[in-house]
């Protein structure tokens, strides 16, 4: 909405030109105003990236100010103590969860290899990449790697940064099943932070918004906006980031291309100076940091190791490409013909359309053609609760041999 447009307003040439022309004068005035409060020699003494250092200091100040004010008006939680990360214990719990999934088929074996490869990867630098296809088990495999790294790095917390709110719920459900230890409250251990998240009480909402939980699952927009936000609600949680491990899924599409150079600079500073560790992942990862606009920047270019060895990557990709068949038509097709063309393919089938309106219309057409019980409609036009119910229903149908045997499952 308007907030996003303002956040990225430097896309306008006139705005950038005006900033370039006035920035030196604005900095001069700023330094004149604060020189008595913060002596220039004190700032100059910091050996690293001063802009990030000052934002961290401002974050601490903003959080302290808001926390004290809330306490004075008795609006702060009575207990702010969140569970510690307890990485070694959670890794053992995750190992048990994954081993219990079982399965003797080829896909299960590949997923076990993927899990072991990520968990046991020996990475000592600030970055790693995980390039493996959808369905290979990245949700648990990368978490195992992060927990193993947390033990070695004495990390404070883990962030899981996902591109869409629609897939956050699925990941949160898995993490809460696999990582919560006896006596803990799931919402306190794995925090779900996005615009559609529901909270059991106001205290949980408050502490989740401040990134106090040991594991935080959030959207790319909410995460990266925090790094640059002037809004106190976001700024005050920034100081919780140092010493953290961050898993960015769909890494190359997490931000608009024009913002990647600045974000990449921040990520390097956080890795080099603030003990952060980044795992950049995707089903088909574009190594954007090797492109000229980023590789040409005057900053150290880190060596980014792969969590998964090349032969396992190829095997996973080969299996997934044989498991899922993509079909398309070069020539346009009418509404009446589309359901019949889809029906020609063996089930289960997933039909993806370009708008929520088209999805609703075609779902109705297919329901009229094959019956309501054989069609599932899933889009952001549905409420979050209805989407969750639909996804649960799809899972049950996929697990039902009778449904698959009839080959009529379509959504």
Each PLM stretch: what is its role?
Residues 124-146:
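Walker A/P-loop
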Residues 180-228:
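Inter-Walker segment of RecA-like/P-loop motor cores
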Residues 1-93:
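Accessory nucleic-acid engagement/destabilization modules that flank
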Residues 157-168, 344-367, 376-377:
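Conserved strand-helix element at the start of the C-terminal RecA-like helicase core
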Residues 221-224, 234-271:
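SF2 helicase catalytic motif II
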Residues 165, 190-203, 354-357, 375-392, ...:
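Conserved helicase motor
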Residues 277, 284-344:
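Interdomain hinge/linker at the junction between the two RecA-like core domains of SF2 helicases
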Residues 155-180, 197, 287, 356:
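Conserved Walker A/P-loop ATP-binding site and its immediately adjacent core
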């Amino acid at each position: 909405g308007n907030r996003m447009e303002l956040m990225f307003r430097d896309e306008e040439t006139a705005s950038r030109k005006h900033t370039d022309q006035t920035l030196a004068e604005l900095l001069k005035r700023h330094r004149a105003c604060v020189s008595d409060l913060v002596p220039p020699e004190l700032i100059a003494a910091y050996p690293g990236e001063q802009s990030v250092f000052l934002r961290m200091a401002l974050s601490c100040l903003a959080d302290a100010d808001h926390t004290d004010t809330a306490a004075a008006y008795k609006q702060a939680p009575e207990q702010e103590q969140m569970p510690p990360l307890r990485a070694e214990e959670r890794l053992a719990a995750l190992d048990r969860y994954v081993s219990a999934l079982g399965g003797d088929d080829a896909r299960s074996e590949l997923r076990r290899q993927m899990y072991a490869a990520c968990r046991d990867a020996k990475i000592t630098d600030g970055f790693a990449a995980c390039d493996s296809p959808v369905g290979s088990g990245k949700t648990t495999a990368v978490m195992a790697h992060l927990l193993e790294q947390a033990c070695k790095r004495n990390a404070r917390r883990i962030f899981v940064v996902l591109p869409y709110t629609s897939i956050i719920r699925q990941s949160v459900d898995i993490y809460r099943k696999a990582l919560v230890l006896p006596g803990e409250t799931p919402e306190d251990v794995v925090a779900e932070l996005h615009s559609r998240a529901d909270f059991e009480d106001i205290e949980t909402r408050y502490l989740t918004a401040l990134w106090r939980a040991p594991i935080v699952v959030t959207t790319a927009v909410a995460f990266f906006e925090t790094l640059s936000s002037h809004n106190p609600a976001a700024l005050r949680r920034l100081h919780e980031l140092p010493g953290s491990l961050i898993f960015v899924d769909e890494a190359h599409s997490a931000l608009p291309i024009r913002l990647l150079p600045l974000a990449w600079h921040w990520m390097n500073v956080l890795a080099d100076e603030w003990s952060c560790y980044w795992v950049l992942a995707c089903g088909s990862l574009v190594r954007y940091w090797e492109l000229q606009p980023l590789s040409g920047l005057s900053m150290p270019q880190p060596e980014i190791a792969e969590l998964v060895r090349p032969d396992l990557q190829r095997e996973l990709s080969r299996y997934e490409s044989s498991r899922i068949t993509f079909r398309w038509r070069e020539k346009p097709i009418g509404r009446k013909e589309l359901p019949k063309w889809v029906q020609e393919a063996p089930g289960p089938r997933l039909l993806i359309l370009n708008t929520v309106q088209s999805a609703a219309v075609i779902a109705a057409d297919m329901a009229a053609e094959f019956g309501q019980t054989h069609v599932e409609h899933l889009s952001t036009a549905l409420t979050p609760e209805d989407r969750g119910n639909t996804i649960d229903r799809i899972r049950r149908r996929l697990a039902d041999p009778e449904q698959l045997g009839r080959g009529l499952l379509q959504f």
